[in-house]
């Protein structure tokens, strides 16, 4: 089948502009394929958004694509090369178990990568087997869709297939392949790779390509590389604020897991915070708390500093001048983050305007929440609904004092109560993909029962809907002496 007929049948409008880059950035390779694949999850709503034929793709025809048994006609899949600072240590990486099938261009001109994750070994696999297990792929499907509904920029999941093979991790698990949709997979680590192992022309080609793809408005600007750096810094500041505002902890914020588009990517050891504690860590390999909840803004800044270092030759031919430009740009992150963070927190507290003591008010609430081990999400839900059930925090003198200050501040707004509540409801999710709910969904799914997962996914489509039907998803996990721990799944 040629590309035209394939497009007519599936809705995929295919290109691969990444192949226009110098060949140090990729390696052409076909997926290994699956012997006995089965379509486990297909994202019908995402398929519709992309203008795809969901009926055809949710069939054996689509299954063969998602299982790596068929590739897009006329387009060679590629594994992308990149580097990464893993827990601060620089290393050569690349797609060790993923292949970019191509790019889908929607009718309104938006371009999306279509990538298979878990499709077999590549030249970048190092010691890995190139495969993925079912539970981590379903986990990414659930959480990425949850993040999307929360309004947080993220890669999406189009499909998950089981391969019919077993993969060895801590134990033997069902093999799987995830089809991931992303604005692109260009990472901070891609630029670090170009700066370390490429020529100046390679670096320039990558920057020009990325600007054209993600920031076309600056493509013809005289100082486009400086503006490029500033745009990426701004997007990351916005993204991290959105993470923090819902208690999302990425878990492995290496430079290879920060994409230039400003989307959330790679959901391996991520989790959502229940009890508010800035030191919260879930990842089994984050022994020192490098990527703890409260440290995520600092880690984003650290990653962006590495990005600016990679761009130095493009910022100015004179190294000293380039360093000064980079420092000035990087210094803006903290100001931007603070601005976006307090704006978001004002909205979570029903405040439309900015006042001098707002920061103290916000910090006062958070410190009280930490002291009394309040649930992050449910505390803001309680404030939104004006219903207080957590005796420990809400009966404390600190909270009562804070509550009076907050009510006084709301009076200064002089807004109708309905307006205030609507603002709070639109910024305080009623439900999130809580860790114990996700784990229950995965546990059942591994046994072949997808009922709970399907119900959870349906509920997560409307996280800001304060519906009685969703109340069961607001319940906290049972108290346990065993802390919740996440794993990369690789």
Curated annotation (Swiss-Prot):
Which EC number(s) does UniProt give?
2.7.7.-, 2.7.7.108
Does this entry carry the keyword Iron-sulfur?
no
Residues annotated as catalytic: 256 (proton acceptor)
Which reactions appear under catalytic activity for this entry?
Answer: L-seryl-[protein] + ATP = 3-O-(5'-adenylyl)-L-seryl-[protein] + diphosphate; L-threonyl-[protein] + ATP = 3-O-(5'-adenylyl)-L-threonyl-[protein] + diphosphate; L-tyrosyl-[protein] + ATP = O-(5'-adenylyl)-L-tyrosyl-[protein] + diphosphate; L-histidyl-[protein] + UTP = N(tele)-(5'-uridylyl)-L-histidyl-[protein] + diphosphate
Name the residues that bind ATP.
Answer: 94, 96-97, 117, 129-130, 180, 187, 266
This chain's function reads: Nucleotidyltransferase involved in the post-translational modification of proteins. It can catalyze the addition of adenosine monophosphate (AMP) or uridine monophosphate (UMP) to a protein, resulting in modifications known as AMPylation and UMPylation.
Protein name (Swiss-Prot/TrEMBL): Protein nucleotidyltransferase YdiU
The species is Clostridium perfringens (strain SM101 / Type A)
């Amino acid at each position: 089948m040629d590309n035209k007929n394939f497009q007519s049948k599936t809705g995929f409008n295919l290109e691969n502009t990444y192949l226009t880059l110098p060949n140090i950035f990729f390696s052409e390779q076909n997926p290994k394929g699956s012997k006995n694949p089965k379509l486990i999850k297909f994202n019908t709503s995402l398929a519709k958004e992309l203008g795809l034929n969901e009926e055809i793709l949710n069939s054996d025809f689509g299954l063969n694509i998602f299982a790596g048994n068929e590739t897009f006609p006329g387009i060679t899949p590629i594994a992308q090369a990149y580097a990464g600072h893993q827990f601060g240590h620089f290393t050569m990486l690349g797609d060790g178990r993923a292949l970019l099938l191509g790019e889908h261009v929607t009718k309104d001109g938006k371009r999306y990568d279509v990538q298979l994750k878990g499709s077999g070994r590549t030249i970048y696999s190092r010691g890995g087997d190139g495969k993925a297990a079912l539970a981590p792929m379903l986990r990414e499907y659930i959480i990425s869709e949850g993040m999307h509904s929360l309004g947080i920029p993220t890669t999406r999941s189009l499909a998950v297939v089981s391969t019919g093979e077993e993969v060895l991790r801590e134990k033997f698990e069902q093999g799987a392949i995830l089809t991931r949709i992303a604005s692109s997979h260009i990472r901070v680590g891609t630029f670090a790779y170009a700066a370390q192992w490429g020529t100046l022309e390679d670096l320039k080609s990558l920057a020009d390509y990325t600007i054209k793809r993600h920031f076309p408005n600056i493509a013809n600007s005289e100082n486009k590389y400086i503006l490029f750096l500033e745009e990426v810094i701004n997007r990351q500041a916005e993204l991290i604020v959105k993470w923090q505002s819902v208690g999302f902890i990425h878990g492995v914020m290496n430079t290879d897991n920060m994409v230039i588009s400003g989307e959330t990517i790679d959901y391996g050891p991520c989790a959502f915070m229940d009890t508010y504690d800035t030191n919260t860590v879930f990842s089994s390999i984050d022994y020192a708390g490098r990527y703890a909840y409260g440290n995520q803004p600092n880690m984003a800044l650290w990653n962006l500093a590495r990005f600016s270092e990679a761009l130095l030759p493009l910022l100015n031919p004179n190294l000293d001048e380039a360093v000064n430009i980079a420092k000035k740009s990087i210094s803006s992150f903290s100001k931007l983050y603070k601005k976006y963070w307090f704006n978001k927190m004002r909205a979570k507290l029903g405040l439309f305007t900015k006042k001098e003591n707002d920061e103290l008010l916000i910090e006062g609430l958070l410190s009280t929440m930490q002291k009394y081990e309040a649930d992050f999400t449910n505390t803001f839900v309680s404030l939104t609904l004006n219903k207080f059930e957590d005796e420990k925090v809400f009966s404390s003198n600190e909270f009562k004092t804070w509550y009076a200050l907050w009510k006084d501040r709301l009076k200064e707004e002089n807004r109708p109560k309905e307006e205030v509540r609507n603002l709070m409801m639109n910024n305080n999710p009623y439900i999130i993909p809580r860790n114990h709910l996700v784990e229950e969904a995965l546990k059942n799914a591994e046994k072949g029962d997808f009922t709970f997962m399907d119900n959870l996914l349906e509920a997560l489509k409307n996280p800001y809907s304060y519906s009685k039907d969703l109340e069961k998803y607001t319940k906290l996990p049972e108290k346990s002496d065993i802390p919740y721990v996440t794993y990369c799944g690789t």
